[in-house]
Structures are given as C-alpha cells and as structure tokens.
C-alpha cells in the first residue's frame, strides 16, 4: 500500500507536472529542439499509461512492481539518459511509419461507423421507449374499463340519494342556528293587548306540571343519632287538679319563764 502511494505520487509529479511545465517553456521560447524533445516524451508517456492499465490488473502482484515503474518514469524524464527519445527513435517511430496508412483507415472507419452506430442506437432507444409507453397506456385503459364494468345498475341504484351536507361558516354561526318552531296551535303573532292566553291557544292548552317538591336536606350524623322525645297529646276538656301543698308552721310554745 505504501509503495503504491509513493509510485502514484512520483508518476504525478515527475511524469506529468514537470514535463507539462517544460513543454510550456518550449512553446513560449519557440525552441524547436526542446519542442521536438517534449513531443517525443508525451508520445512515449501516453503509450506507457495505456500499458500501465493492463499491467496493474495482471502483474501488480509481481515483486518490486511499483519500484520498477517509478524507476522507468524517472528514466524517461532524465536529461542524461533521454529514455523517451531513445524509445521513440528505436521502436515507436519505425512501427508507426510502417502501419500509418492502416491506422488512418481504421480511424476513418471508426468515425463513420461510430456516427452510424449512434444513430441506430438512438432509433432503437426511441422505439423501445415508445412501445413501453403504448403498452402502459393500453394496460391502464383495460384496468379502468374492467373497473367500470364491475359496477352494475343495481349497485348504482343502491347508492342512497342523501342530500349534500350543509356547510356551516364559523364566522356566522348565529345566523345559521335554526330558530325554535312554535308549538302546534300557537298563533305566530304572539300575545297582543286585546288577546288573552286562551285566544292564543287554539285547540289544546299545555297542562301545567306540578311543582317539584323540594328535596329535604339529609340529616347530619349527629342529628340522626339524637332521639326526639315527643310530648303526649293533651286531651281537650280535661284539667289537672293541682294540689297545693301547705306547709305547716310549727308555732313554738311559750316557755314558762
């Protein structure tokens, strides 16, 4: 893991950033020699990046694989070894010059076929989307028609013909409260100066209810335990004879002196 991180850092800094800045300096100074040198480097480095994708998949387990890759990048970039120029002159340029016409023909065919393939794939995609939309629409219409057919006339007649519920506005509740209907036989005009109560009631008269008896207060516990003694009734026409007790005074006898 550590070797992989170091390898990626070396490839990024010494394989891309430094050559990119050197190419900028060559274009700015219009030095043809440096310009050709860095063009050869970028061609070789592009081939290296293409081969790296395959080698990372199959031979990344090889011992010292990342160390070898770092050394190869430094060898390509070094001005002393001039590895990029050497590989280009020995291998890349001769092979490209031999197969240049074939490569150009393949590129032209790829452009034409790519345009045709894009159009064909676009048409197929539109056809598939249109057929899917039509199938979805037909399925939904069939389900709706089956749902409507399931309702028979008896089911429709069985629906109660109830009136719509009245809406009560909370701001005007007093106007919407229904007034009490007068009792049967009562004249709508009410009592007047010349009318009496018997005239206001045409046929029947309300029977007055007996006044409710007041509920007796419950006895307190102390009162309920008391025994009320009642005096016997006094009969009329009788009188008691009152005996008057007289005290006899003892007269002291005169003592003979």
From Swiss-Prot:
PTM-bearing positions, type Phosphothreonine: 196, 250
InterPro entries the record matches: TB2_DP1_HVA22
Annotated keywords: Cell cycle, Cell division, Endoplasmic reticulum, Membrane, Microtubule, Mitosis, Phosphoprotein, Transmembrane, Transmembrane helix
GO cellular component labels: cytoplasmic microtubule; endoplasmic reticulum; endoplasmic reticulum membrane; endoplasmic reticulum tubular network
GO BP terms: cell division; endoplasmic reticulum tubular network organization; mitotic nuclear membrane reassembly; nuclear envelope organization
Recorded GO MF terms: microtubule binding
A Pfam family assignment: TB2_DP1_HVA22
Transmembrane portions of the chain: 1-21, 42-62
Primary location: endoplasmic reticulum
Renumbered residue ranges of the record's region Disordered: 178-257
Subcellular location field: Endoplasmic reticulum membrane
Membrane topology recorded in Swiss-Prot or TrEMBL: Multi-pass membrane protein
Modified-residue entries (Phosphoserine), positions: 152, 194, 202, 253
Similarity annotation: Belongs to the DP1 family.
Protein role: Microtubule-binding protein required to ensure proper cell division and nuclear envelope reassembly by sequestering the endoplasmic reticulum away from chromosomes during mitosis. Probably acts by clearing the endoplasmic reticulum membrane from metaphase chromosomes.
Name of the molecule in the record: Receptor expression-enhancing protein 4
């Amino acid at each position: 893991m550590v070797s992989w991180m170091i390898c990626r850092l070396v490839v990024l800094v010494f394989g891309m950033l430094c050559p990119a800045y050197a190419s900028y300096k060559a274009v700015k100074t219009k030095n043809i020699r440096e310009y050709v040198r860095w063009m050869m480097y970028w061609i070789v480095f592009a081939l290296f990046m293409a081969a790296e994708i395959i080698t990372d998949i199959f031979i990344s387990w090889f011992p010292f694989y990342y160390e070898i890759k770092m050394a190869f990048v430094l060898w390509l970039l070094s001005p002393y070894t001039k590895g990029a120029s050497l590989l280009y002159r020995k291998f890349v340029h001769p092979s490209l010059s031999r197969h240049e016409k074939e490569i150009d023909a393949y590129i032209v065919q790829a452009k034409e076929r790519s345009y045709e393939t894009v159009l064909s794939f676009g048409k197929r995609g539109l056809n598939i989307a249109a057929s899917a939309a039509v199938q979805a629409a037909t399925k939904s219409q069939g389900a709706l028609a089956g749902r409507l057919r399931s309702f028979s006339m008896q089911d429709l007649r069985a629906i109660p013909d109830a009136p719509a519920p009245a809406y009560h506005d909370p701001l005007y509740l007093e106007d919407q409260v229904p007034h009490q209907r007068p009792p049967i036989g009562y004249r709508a005009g009410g009592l007047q100066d010349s009318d009496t109560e018997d005239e206001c009631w045409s046929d029947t008269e309300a029977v007055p209810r007996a006044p409710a008896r007041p509920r007796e207060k419950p006895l307190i516990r102390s009162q309920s335990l008391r025994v009320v003694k009642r005096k016997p009734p006094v009969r009329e026409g009788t009188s008691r004879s009152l005996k008057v007790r007289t005290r006899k005074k003892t007269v002291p006898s005169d003592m003979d002196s």
